[in-house]
Swiss-Prot record:
Coiled coil: none
Gene: clns1a
Biological role: Involved in both the assembly of spliceosomal snRNPs and the methylation of Sm proteins. Chaperone that regulates the assembly of spliceosomal U1, U2, U4 and U5 small nuclear ribonucleoproteins (snRNPs), the building blocks of the spliceosome, and thereby plays an important role in the splicing of cellular pre-mRNAs. Most spliceosomal snRNPs contain a common set of Sm proteins SNRPB, SNRPD1, SNRPD2, SNRPD3, SNRPE, SNRPF and SNRPG that assemble in a heptameric protein ring on the Sm site of the small nuclear RNA to form the core snRNP (Sm core).
InterPro entries cross-referenced by the UniProt entry: ICln, ICln/Lot5/Saf5, PH-like_dom_sf
Protein name: Methylosome subunit pICln
Organism: Xenopus laevis (African clawed frog)
GO biological process, one term: spliceosomal snRNP assembly
Assembly description: Component of the methylosome, a 20S complex containing at least clns1a/picln, prmt5/skb1 and wdr77/mep50; may mediate snrpd1 and snrpd3 methylation. Forms a 6S pICln-Sm complex composed of clns1a/picln, snrpd1, snrpd2, snrpe, snrpf and snrpg; ring-like structure where clns1a/pICln mimics additional Sm proteins and which is unable to assemble into the core snRNP.
Cellular localization per UniProt: Cytoplasm, Cytosol; Nucleus; Cytoplasm, Cytoskeleton
Domain of life: Eukaryota
């Protein structure tokens, strides 16, 4: 299988060294080897010094899989946002790439590769997973950082303010605001205040919550009680404010 290459094992920042770990890439077993969970990348090498290495930004998911129906042994499951293939598969893929793009212009699905790391000691899965989490956190998704920078608030320039170069908004008190109204505006404001005053004075609240006028008259033999709403009726309701 030509996806394996020779490279020196990582020496710095190794959080977890797991010998006797079988690698299964895309359903094909590669035999036992050593898994290196390092801060820079995730690497696996067999006894001949051949293996593969993954960069953390390319890893979209890692988890402990205990579902023996999906795979007969418990393992560390890793999903990669690329297609790991041998040399023959890569050449065939490159030959058909243009034809596939012309036929499937609307297909935006990203190729993925499923990798399973099966340790000899299943009790080590928890520490393997924790080491993966720690190393993955050192390589945040750059798209998340870009989304955080999409909105930037206006900066307050202290130096410009001291030099009088900043337009400071003008605020008025209620009385000062009235003095800036035109005659027509003052008349409109007075009319609105009168309407609001009349509306409050004639307020009648239905559903038995509160009334300031006479109680409702019975109609068609039905008794309408002008009482408080039953306490606790909506205590469990989650209201968005």
């Amino acid at each position: 299988m030509n996806l394996l290459s020779s490279f020196p094992p990582p020496a710095d920042g190794v959080r977890r060294l797991q010998p006797g770990t079988e690698a299964v890439v895309g359903g094909r077993g590669l035999g036992p080897g050593t898994l290196y969970i390092a801060e820079s990348r995730l690497s696996w090498l067999n006894g001949s010094g051949l293996g593969f290495s993954l960069e953390y930004p390319s890893i979209s998911l890692h988890a402990i899989s205990r579902d023996t129906a999906a795979y007969p042994e418990e393992h560390l499951y890793v999903m990669v946002n690329s297609k790991l293939a041998d040399k023959e598969d890569k050449e065939a893929h490159m030959a058909d790439q243009e034809e596939e793009e012309s036929e499937d212009d609307d297909d935006d699905e990203e190729p993925i590769t499923e990798i399973r790391f099966v340790p000899g000691e299943k009790s080590d899965l928890g520490e393997m997973f924790s080491a993966m989490c720690d190393c993955q956190a050192l390589h945040p998704d750059p798209e998340d950082a870009d989304s955080d920078d999409d909105y930037e608030g206006d900066e307050y320039d202290v130096e410009a303010h001291e030099q009088g170069q900043v337009d400071v908004p003008t605020f008025y008190t209620y009385e000062e605001g009235l003095s800036h109204l035109t005659t027509e505006g003052q008349a409109t404001l007075e009319r609105l205040e009168n309407m609001l005053s009349n509306s409050i004075g004639n307020q009648h609240t239905m559903a038995g919550v509160r009334t300031e006028g006479p109680a409702l008259e019975p109609e068609d033999g039905m008794d309408v009680e002008n009482t408080q709403t039953v306490a606790g009726q909506f205590e469990d309701a989650d209201v968005d404010h």
